[in-house]
Amino acid sequence: MARYTGPSCRLCRRENTELFLKGERCYTDKCAIKRRNYPPGQHGQGRSKTSDYGVQLREKQKVRRIYGILENQFRGYFERADRLKGVTGENLLFLLERRLDNIVYRLGFASSRIEARQLVRHGHFTLNGKKVTIPSIQVKTGDTVELREKSRKVASINESLEAVVRRGIPQWLELDKGAFKGSVKTLPVREDITMPIQEQLIVELYSK
């Protein structure tokens, strides 16, 4: 499945929730879903009731788009989550939260996960002192993510760090803003993920 390259705001309207795909714009009145809270398209305001399967599919698509994951990769995360001990749906969210690009976003180095992924791929960060360029790396407790010295004057990164107060930093992470680095204090728990996600719907979809 190809990566979506169309307008990001249409995805938020399609899923009827804020996916925070456009950085700071999503926190302003310019956010499309605040202005037009209905699906895109000619018949967006008059669509009929969705089936159970449709509801499950939309939830899966929503989570996929929040984290910017392609279908095959997302299914791979689900299969891995299903093999782990614990609740499959929660395991899935934990695996997605522990992606390096998500950590970069959560710490405030980027205004969106899309931007965070680009920054990682372009080699702006180190993980435990080593340069990394793979956004999907899974972090673990005690890991340290640091912005490389040569990247500390990048305007967009500094602007994101200044604005991080708006969305806050999860309790399981710690940011040393002055040193341009953050660390993983502990692994996330379900209460740390405050986005409106019903992961059980995804489990039901993939279990058919």
Swiss-Prot record:
GO cellular component terms, A-Z: small ribosomal subunit
Keyword Iron-sulfur: no
Database matches in Pfam families: Ribosomal_S4 (PF00163), S4 (PF01479)
Entries under SMART domains matching the protein: Ribosomal_S4 (SM01390), S4 (SM00363)
GO terms of biological process kind: ribosomal small subunit biogenesis; translation
Source taxon at top rank: Bacteria
Keywords recorded for this protein, A-Z: Ribonucleoprotein, Ribosomal protein, RNA-binding, rRNA-binding
Keyword Ribonucleoprotein listed: yes
One annotated GO molecular function: rRNA binding
Xref: InterPro entries: Ribosomal_uS4 (IPR022801), Ribosomal_uS4_bac-type (IPR005709), Ribosomal_uS4_CS (IPR018079), Ribosomal_uS4_N (IPR001912), S4_RNA-bd (IPR002942), S4_RNA-bd_sf (IPR036986)
S4 RNA-binding domain residues: 98-158
Subunit structure: Part of the 30S ribosomal subunit. Contacts protein S5. The interaction surface between S4 and S5 is involved in control of translational fidelity.
Assigned protein family: Belongs to the universal ribosomal protein uS4 family.
NCBIfam families listed in its UniProt record: PRK05327.1, rpsD_bact
Role played: One of the primary rRNA binding proteins, it binds directly to 16S rRNA where it nucleates assembly of the body of the 30S subunit. With S5 and S12 plays an important role in translational accuracy.
Name of this chain's protein: Small ribosomal subunit protein uS4
Organism expressing this protein natively: Geotalea daltonii (strain DSM 22248 / JCM 15807 / FRC-32)
Taxon lineage: Bacteria, Pseudomonadati, Thermodesulfobacteriota, Desulfuromonadia, Geobacterales
Gene name of the encoded protein: rpsD
